[in-house]
Curated annotation (Swiss-Prot):
Species this chain originates from: Shewanella woodyi (strain ATCC 51908 / MS32)
Protein name: Diaminopimelate epimerase
Coarse class of the protein's main subcellular location: cytoplasm
Matching Gene3D superfamilies: Diaminopimelate Epimerase, Chain A, domain 1
Function field: Catalyzes the stereoinversion of LL-2,6-diaminopimelate (L,L-DAP) to meso-diaminopimelate (meso-DAP), a precursor of L-lysine and an essential component of the bacterial peptidoglycan.
Lineage: Bacteria, Pseudomonadati, Pseudomonadota, Gammaproteobacteria, Alteromonadales
PANTHER family attached to this UniProt entry: DIAMINOPIMELATE EPIMERASE, DIAMINOPIMELATE EPIMERASE, CHLOROPLASTIC
UniProt entry tagged with the keyword Nucleotide-binding: no
GO biological process terms on file: lysine biosynthetic process via diaminopimelate
UniProt keyword annotations, A-Z: Amino-acid biosynthesis, Cytoplasm, Isomerase, Lysine biosynthesis
């Protein structure tokens, strides 16, 4: 049997599996079946804890979307990852260093039960997002065709270990997240697809956000999306260094000292239950 934990970060839910003490492998088809909320465990992403490839690190962190595809980063998942490895006795550290397929991050368990994640330095270089553009801009013009004919969107583009585009909206409640998100997530200017954030600026220290995630549609919360929105808003001169981000599933705090500096995200990580499935 394979033992797992069901966890969530602000309603963004995960199946978390210990690949350190268990020998596990999941095919994309298996992940799709397990992600099904009627016939499987049901989750937005599967998180796999693996031994480190670098002796200076504690673990390797892998993330799989509900469609079975592996992705580079998940901020809400990172907080759950930290809580999981502590709960399962895989480490007794309060500060945990892990690698992902796209870099390294540091996780810190706080006294109040929250987890703070050093999400690394936001990537603005279009070639590294990846995003097809000639140079770095604070705002890009995206054009796309649909049944609504040609549409144009203004967005910020950034990578937090995974690609994001961020659109500002006047009213988050009435934003066309499903339609526009589905339209932009596979836009040809993003060769690896993109997560699409819809940001309403309340004031310089507070935004509301909804995110259409690549491979998972809209989720209750997206940690990297919150980081991307806070960074884009700051670069555009609309937000402070510390920002409260309200998502449908709850609130995150983002702290960024600006270009060239790592971005820090703080929020909860909740354990729901432990389970097991056949090998």
């Amino acid at each position: 049997m394979i033992h797992f934990a069901k966890m969530h970060g602000l309603g963004n839910d995960f199946m978390v599996v210990d690949g350190v003490t268990q020998n596990v492998f999941f095919s994309p088809e298996q992940i799709k079946r397990l992600a099904d909320r009627n016939f499987g465990v049901g989750f937005d992403q599967l998180l796999l804890v693996e031994p480190p490839y670098d002796p200076d690190l504690d673990f390797h962190y892998r993330i799989f979307n509900a469609d079975g595809g592996e992705v580079e980063q998940c901020g809400n998942g990172a907080r759950c990852f930290a809580r999981f490895v502590r709960n399962k006795g895989l480490t007794n550290k309060h500060k945990i260093k892990v690698s992902t397929s796209n870099g390294k991050i540091t996780l810190r368990l706080e006294r109040d039960g929250n987890v703070t994640v050093n999400m690394g330095v936001p990537v603005l270089d279009p070639s590294k997002i990846p995003f097809n553009a000639k140079r770095v801009e604070k705002t890009y013009l995206l054009q796309t065709s649909s049944s609504h004919a040609m549409e144009t969107f203004l967005c910020g583009a950034i990578s937090m270990g995974n690609p994001h585009c961020v659109l500002e909206v006047e009213d988050i409640e009435h934003a066309e997240v499903e339609r526009i998100g589905a339209l932009l997530t596979q836009n040809e200017r993003f060769p690896k697809g993109v997560n699409v954030g819809f940001m309403q600026v309340i004031d310089a220290g507070h935004i509301k956000l909804r995110v259409y995630e690549r491979g998972a549609a809209e989720t209750l919360a997206c940690g990297t999306g919150a980081c991307a929105a806070a960074a884009v808003g700051q670069l555009q001169g609309k937000l402070n260094k510390m920002v409260r981000v309200d998502l449908p599933g709850g609130t995150l705090t983002i702290n960024w000292e600006g270009e060239g500096n790592p971005l820090w995200m703080t929020g909860p990580a909740e354990h729901v239950y432990d389970g097991q499935i056949p090998q």
